[in-house]
Amino acid sequence: MAGTMHLLTAVSLILMLSSANAESTVYNLLTSPDCLPDLLHGGLAEQGVTELYILTTFRIQPGTGNTIFSLYNPRDNSKYFEFSVFGKANKAILRYLRRDGRMSAVTFNKLNLADGEKHRLLFHLKGLEVGHPGGFPHSQGALPVPGVELHLDCRLVETLRDLPAVFNGLNNHQAVELKTMQGKAQEGLEELKLAYGDSVENVASLQDCHTQSDSVQALGLNTKQLTTQMLELTKVINELKDVLIQQVKETSFLRNTISECQACGLSGAEVVKPKCAPGVCFRDDMCIETAEGVECGPCPDGYTGDGYSCDDVDECQFNPCFPGVRCVNMAPGFRCEACPLGFTGKPLEGVGVAYAQTHKQVCDDIDECKGPDNGGCTANSICVNSVGSYQCGRCKTGFTGDQIRGCKPEKSCGNRLQNPCDPNAQCTEERDGTITCQCGIGWAGNGYLCGKDTDIDGYPDERLRCRDPTCRKDNCVTVPNSGQEDADGDGKGDACDPDADGDGILNEQDNCWLTPNINQQNSDKDSHGDACDNCVRVDNPDQRDTDSDGLGDACDDDMDGDGLKNFLDNCQRVKNRDQLDRDGDGVGDACDSCPDIPNPNQSDIDNDLVGDSCDTNQDSDGDGHQDSKDNCPMVINSSQLDTDKDGIGDECDDDDDNDGIPDSLPPGPDNCRLVPNPEQIDDNNDGVGDICESDFDQDKVIDRIDNCPENAEITLTDFRAYQTVVLDPEGDAQIDPNWVVLNQGMEIVQTMNSDPGLAVGYTAFSGVDFEGTFHVNTVTDDDYAGFIFGYQDSSSFYVVMWKQTEQTYWQATPFRAVAEPGIQLKAVKSKTGPGEHLRNSLWHTGDTNDQVRLLWKDPRNVGWKDKVSYRWYLQHRPQVGYIRVRFYEGTELVADSGVTIDTTMRGGRLGVFCFSQENIIWSNLKYRCNDTIPEDFQEFSTQHGMDPL
């Protein structure tokens, strides 16, 4: 036995040495990228390739980032396989499309690849599916376990137990192209190769990584040991020769002995026949006694074997179940689970191969569009049934509108007058009876003429034949820029102009990308050139300028412009010439978070604009204002509107304008509830007083363009004044967000790959409609972006957030957080507040105790697409807890939460949200005060047994 083992060892060594001399097939993808589609569309499988290598060598400058290479579909810009480096965050991310069609991401932290040095990367992909086996040594025998090994600078750093789908063969209709990093000075991609047909050790040598085979290392072999093994092999063979000679002699002796026994008549001895006994056959009832002995009958249905032993047949391999339905193998038999959502049919059970081959589960599509409710689509709209689902389309011929506002007769507009609007616009009757037209989502113009608006920023792709500003051609057709900023006046908007200031220096390298400065002079080294630096000789990277006088706060001796020098001003960033300070804490009342209680440090740990010294967190009505500061402590009124400034909020004031005419009781109702008019003059007897006929709140903005016609404090959407809230203030996992506000507060851009953070406006709302265009203007990274509403403090708010791919958060403390792709609506009510618990809870898709509740998730599990614009439309009515959010891609409704009821936050402020995602644009932002309860709330209440209003 020992000799046999020596023989096997020597033979295996010879096989290893022979395979180590195999030659690789190597493709240089930098010079021949066109070979890649043929290989991925079946070329590798046809050659029997089961192991594949991708080698790349690159150099990235410190503090920068780049996508090293990416395999993607040029038709829809979707990714198959991508490796990116983030220098500032000191990490790298591998993203890939899984075989189940979902994106996955692996994050490598504390990986300093952006250091100006050359780095070598080797991907070893194993377990590829084979089309015609036998092409290479690796295709012989058992296939390797599918997975990916990542070697960095000749060192194994990660092993994935999954194989990206792109390397298992693409369908012919799935286009694939290669995109490589665009290097700047002092950096670039030096090598990108694809290899197969050899060992990882030999392939690694192409990158000057000289390693021994793992198996050779384990044996500790060298040339001397090989010689010793060969000598031992010769010795063993000689010993085996002697043994065989002896065995031949013994066999001959036995044959002669048997012959002699037969000659003596011993062959007549009675032979005892075996009989059936328990355990002889697979089942006792299968045992048969014959003249020749015992036989076993055939295996029963659902099993295979010789009758003595029978093994269960996996009938599921014959695909008896409806596509998408789970098949459960049993012993014996199989079972198909219920038909998927959108289909109807019976479960299927059976036993045996024949049954599985001749019986297939049948699931019939449910036509949701049949029936009186039109599939749930708005009346008079088109419901399109599809296999397993349905979609709500445009209004039927003769009707106009959309799924939000309903479909009305095309020739009428509320007052039954002829509809003057464009077919792609909505017609609205205002409170004074006038008609306004507004282009629908995905369209832009003046409402009477509408054109296609690809990026949904409010400007048409092509110029329209009308004079309104919104009829002009969009200067960035595919990048939303609702302000149409164009610094160099070349007709190409700053958002899509690679040299926005026209000075010949590209934006990425220009230290004043909106101001021409060929010399790039920078006296203070704060990354802002002198030509655009509001403090030329003082470092101020944030460029903050409170009074907008062109002089940055860092070098302005009167930051708020109130005429008082900073060292004398008790509110340095808030104008207050009176310098009132009731509590004498050195902080003026105008900027004091506790004006009646001394708190010189102005600490506000929960970011609710109320200092910790006077923050009681006692809020009886849940509207975000503590009772001691709430002008209606027992009535929900998050906006705190007090028209007559009498200290009583309008929501609980019987006479809002204090003109002596009650709002609703006799001798009212007041025909101008917000404007004093004791005479109640109404010449046209339309029920609206003359003084407020077209401007109900008398804020000098007519109602039809007023975002809040019943609130004189709010007229237009404006986020220029905002509060920044950092949700993970501790640690150095990432950096804080960088917010840039454009278009007079109606557009926000976040530029950094950052920790979770919020930019929150200071205006609080009760009922509100909030809409905007969401766009990720990069192909780098795949994380969270969204918006918030009902913000009351840094532990209490609603967030709508969208993740592109599935990913486990790279910080496993305090718990493992897994993000799934798709849109999520969450209610945040955190007991800990900003920190690692809230951070991981926001990342995680699902509920987390005492932190976050998932109210709704888009069942499609679809991530956002790179450089694609989406329009959201939110309705929030905190008085009844009504929430509904819709998302559009172009003109198509792609996600709808439906009616969601939650009363955790009874109103609050609005803002935007980001988490580890850079280059996010929130464009064409609009908010409108609206306390009207939508019609679908009544339907929802009836169906769910709630108390109607």
Swiss-Prot record:
UniProt domain Laminin G-like: residue ranges: 23-198
InterPro entries: ConA-like_dom_sf, EGF-like_Ca-bd_dom, EGF-like_dom, EGF_Ca-bd_CS, NOTCH1_EGF-like, Thrombospondin_3-like_rpt, Thrombospondin_3_rpt, Thrombospondin_C
Transmembrane segment boundaries: none
A Pfam family annotated for this UniProt entry: EGF_CA
Domain named TSP C-terminal: residues: 720-934
Major site of localization recorded for this protein: endoplasmic reticulum
Highest rank taxon of the organism: Eukaryota
Keyword match Glycoprotein: yes
Glycosylation, residue list: 601, 637, 930
Acidic residues bias: start-end ranges: 649-660
GO biological process: cell adhesion; positive regulation of cell division; response to unfolded protein; tendon development
Residue segments, region Disordered: 578-671
Keywords of the record: Calcium, Cell adhesion, Disulfide bond, EGF-like domain, Endoplasmic reticulum, Extracellular matrix, Glycoprotein, Growth factor, Mitogen, Repeat, Sarcoplasmic reticulum, Secreted, Signal, Unfolded protein response
TSP type-3 repeat boundaries on the chain: 452-484, 485-520, 521-543, 544-579, 580-602, 603-640, 641-680, 681-716
PROSITE patterns: EGF_2, EGF_3, EGF_CA, TSP3, TSP_CTER
GO cellular component, one term: endoplasmic reticulum
Function according to Swiss-Prot or TrEMBL: Adhesive glycoprotein that mediates cell-to-cell and cell-to-matrix interactions and may be involved in various processes including cellular proliferation, migration, adhesion and attachment. May play a role in ER stress response.
Protein name per Swiss-Prot or TrEMBL: Thrombospondin-4-B
Organism of this sequence: Danio rerio
